[in-house]
Amino acid sequence: MPPKHNPLGLNPLQLRTLTLLQQLARLPDYSQPGEEAGSIALTRLPHPHGDHFHIGEAVVSSRDATGLRNPAVWAALERKGLVRSTPPSAVVTPRGLDYDTGLRETILHWADHG
């Protein structure tokens, strides 16, 4: 039997937010190794300009990132063991890094932006 998609039952906003946190964790401009083995500490979050923002080479619609500033989303992700919130930053746990949201190709756009 194939693995269940979204086994933790994350809602769409939580899935989008985790997808963005996973991408931020891949980039040294936004992250560094965490204290826990396999975790990544996020050192900052991107700021939107207009209707989008950049995560490295990817362009993301601001509407897909509303969860980055939503305390309820962070609380849910933390409760499910995917992140640890340590304001003003956060740690994405190994479980959070490995969780397949299925949205990476949907919300991260790799177009040229000038």
Residue ranges of each PLM-predicted region?
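Generic signal for short, ordered secondary-structure residues
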Residues: 55-57, 75, 106
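Short amphipathic alpha-helical interaction segments
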Residues: 61-80, 84
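Short, amphipathic alpha-helical interaction segments positioned at domain boundaries
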Residues: 3, 79, 97-114
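Short, amphipathic alpha-helical interface elements at domain boundaries
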Residues: 1-65
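Minor-groove-contacting beta-hairpin "wing" of winged helix-turn-helix DNA-binding domains
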Residues: 89-94
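Amphipathic alpha-helical interaction segments
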Residues: 28, 81-84, 103
